[in-house]
């Protein structure tokens, strides 16, 4: 005669199956992954309740044979594994949906450049400045960008990442090309828009420069020079080789750890992997896969190494923000996000 535990298990299984079936029959209720997971757990619980010996092989593997509640614990372990599998599947679907939306935002924003494009390829150096509510800092940054670098003309592109202030108007008034995201999408998304614009305009070299005044535009030639001389395809500015006004020991320690990890995974010899002051040969951008709207540094660095770009770092200076507060969030959030993208890119 079935035990009370098996009877309770069967009743619970039937309840789960009923709930899952009703949810799966609803139309327009969003993702079906949660309901499908409940259904699988219910079917599994029903199977075990009717034929408990079916889980014995897994119970043996887990070392739970002979334990008083071994079979129940085994069922719980299987259920948790199914739930985690469904969770990762749902997260993957959400990530892919987010990437599709992000690509649409970037494409629509980059299309704005056609309104300002005249004649043939732009050539020269396109200085991409991602900006989110930096109307107060942009005038000083743009004023310091030289008109020529290493014998090449410079062009300024400000990517307004959905600012609520006058960032776009200020940038346009200072003579910069401006494209604007309709919503705040993240610095990585803004830079990807900049890369897309650079390819459409036919720029030779792309320089990325923060809008908060931390990067010294007078040092752009240090980044561009090695590419012009065909010594590198991708040049990274390094505060380790240069100077920094940072007063955060925790952040500095984290950068050191992640620099070692990136070099280990990518086979590079970079001394600063968290600096956004960089230059890259525009013709090589299409060889790197970009998917991250945030914490884009590891994706770019590992992608460049995987694509076989010649990577070089040069000394630069990191200054304090001219005004306002950093948009990068806390050190912990930044560190966790950086690690997540680094591992995700390496495993891709």
What positions do the PLM features span?
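A conserved acidic beta->alpha catalytic loop
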Residues: 160-168, 213
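Acceptor/aglycone-binding surface of glycosyltransferases and processive sugar-polymer synthases
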Residues: 177-200, 205, 217-294, 320-330, ...
């Amino acid at each position: 005669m079935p035990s009370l535990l098996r009877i309770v298990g069967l009743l619970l299984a039937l309840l789960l199956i009923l709930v899952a079936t009703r949810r799966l029959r609803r139309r327009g209720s969003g993702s079906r992954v949660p309901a499908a997971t409940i259904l699988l757990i219910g079917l599994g619980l029903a199977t075990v309740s009717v034929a408990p010996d079916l889980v014995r092989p897994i119970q043996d593997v887990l070392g739970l044979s002979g334990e008083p509640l071994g079979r129940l614990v085994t069922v719980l372990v299987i259920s948790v594994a199914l739930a985690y599998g469904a969770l990762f599947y749902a997260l993957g679907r959400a990530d892919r949906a987010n990437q599709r939306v992000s690509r649409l935002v970037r494409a629509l924003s980059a299309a704005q450049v056609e309104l300002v494009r005249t004649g043939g390829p732009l050539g020269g150096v396109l200085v991409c400045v991602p900006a989110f509510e930096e109307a107060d800092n942009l005038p000083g940054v743009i004023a310091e960008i030289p008109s020529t670098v290493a014998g090449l003309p410079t062009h300024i592109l400000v990517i307004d990442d959905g600012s609520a202030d006058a960032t776009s108007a200020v940038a346009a008034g200072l003579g910069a090309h401006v494209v604007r995201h309709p919503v705040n999408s993240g610095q990585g998304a803004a830079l990807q828009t900049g890369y897309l614009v650079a390819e459409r305009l036919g720029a030779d070299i792309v320089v990325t420069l923060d809008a908060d005044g931390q990067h010294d535009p007078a040092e752009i030639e240090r980044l561009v020079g090695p590419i012009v001389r065909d010594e590198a395809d991708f040049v990274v500015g390094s505060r380790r080789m240069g100077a920094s006004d940072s007063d955060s020991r925790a952040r500095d320690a984290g950068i050191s750890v992640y620099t070692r990890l990136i070099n280990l995974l990518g086979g590079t010899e970079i001394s600063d992997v968290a600096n956004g002051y960089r230059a890259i040969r525009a013709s090589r951008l299409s060889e790197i896969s970009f998917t991250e709207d945030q914490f884009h540094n590891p994706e770019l660095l590992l992608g460049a190494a995987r694509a076989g770009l010649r990577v070089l770092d040069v000394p630069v200076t990191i200054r304090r923000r001219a005004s306002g507060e950093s948009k990068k969030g806390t050190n912990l959030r930044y560190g966790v996000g950086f690690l997540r993208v680094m591992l995700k890119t390496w495993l891709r």
